[in-house]
Amino acid sequence: MSKIIDEILSSLSRSRIFRNRELLLPDYVPEELPHREEQIKRLVEILSPLMRGEKPNNIFIYGLTGTGKTAVTKFVVKKLHEKISNSFIYVYINTRQTDTPYRILADLLENLGSKVPFTGISTAELYRRFIKKVLELKPILVIVLDEIDALVKKHGDDILYRLTRANYEMGKSKVSIIGITNDIKFVEFLDPRVKSSLSEEEIVFPPYNAEELEDILKRRATLAFYDSVVSDDVIKLCAAIAARDHGDARRALDLLRVAGEVAERDGAEKLTIEHVNKARVEIERDRVYEVVSTLPFHSKLVLLAIVIGVNEKRRTLTTGEVYDVYTKLAKKIGVESVTQRRVSDIINELDMLGIITARVVNRGRYGKTKEVNLAVNEETVIKAISEKDSKIASLWDR
């Protein structure tokens, strides 16, 4: 067994594919951000009051995944801080990871130098301490809240209301907020008071086109790979695939990185179209696994009902048929089933995630119905459900 490990490690150590793999990872912020000059300029203009020691307006940054929102924000704030570090301090928080109001306030306090116990203090007390700490500061505090929609959908917008009210409560303009979201419609669901405070300035990041993605990939490939490893054809294919997926630069970079890893495992000296196609399958499998494994319990059960029903009937299912299979599964594992209306909503949600297809069809005098089918690899779905939910996994033992 150790011989196999030694052989693999030896092969990888001889690889001449990657010069620096980390330059292709999502959290890497390059020194150049091509095709985002307009957004960089706009963000610098909005934040320019910091040069005078004044609080800039709050900013909402919109754009689909992989359009450069986070990279540009981190880049601009970091560069400004290098030039005028005495004027402001900044804290970056990804609210999908730091996903409760308590942890957000705790993170803010810890970044400002205060120690916070993991539990035992109320959110209200944390907020009081936060206000007190900010008042002690001389510089302006810039708070970057990334994926802000994830937080609000889970816990509401009370924490945003508190943060936007902080300046009023202190009697001083000390806190500026930059909110970043993938959901362009998200702001419509905010309390009007939060909406007006947060949306003082707005910047929209459009998707990249294929030519822009090619340029981004070429620049990054020059740094990340050894010379002559990546051909123009490989770059063009990665860019074309990502351009079809709403111009997602993150997807393009992931595709190029995973293609390099596939080539490395194959012992190849160069990346090929075949490596890109293999990487595409691998990434899609990983994406499906991640999405399915994090679904709520009843969404997983409905999805499993679709898998079982389609296999049994050898055809697409109606919404009613999905509900019938779902209720039988719920009864088997001893859980109370949700209503047919809720199952219909779950089907729509799974369709939006791209896990299933739900097509409305007209059946004449029988009226309209939905034809439901699985849109991804069945084995990956079953693996994600069974490994992440023991209660549903018990169905396999019955």
From Swiss-Prot:
Pfam families: AAA_22 (PF13401), Cdc6_C (PF09079), Cdc6_lid (PF22703). The keyword Repeat does not apply. SUPFAM superfamilies: P-loop containing nucleoside triphosphate hydrolases, Winged helix' DNA-binding domain. Keywords: ATP-binding, DNA replication, Nucleotide-binding. The keyword Nucleotide-binding applies. InterPro entries: AAA+_ATPase, AAA_22, Cdc6_C, Cdc6_lid, ORC1/CDC6, Orc1/Cdc6_arc, P-loop_NTPase, WH-like_DNA-bd_sf. GO terms for biological process: DNA replication. One of its GO terms (molecular function) is ATP hydrolysis activity. ATP binds at residues 67-71, 208, 220. Disulfide bonds: none annotated. PANTHER family: CELL DIVISION CONTROL PROTEIN 6 HOMOLOG, CELL DIVISION CONTROL PROTEIN 6-RELATED. Involved in regulation of DNA replication. Belongs to the CDC6/cdc18 family. This is ORC1-type DNA replication protein 1. It comes from Sulfurisphaera tokodaii (strain DSM 16993 / JCM 10545 / NBRC 100140 / 7). The gene is cdc6-1.
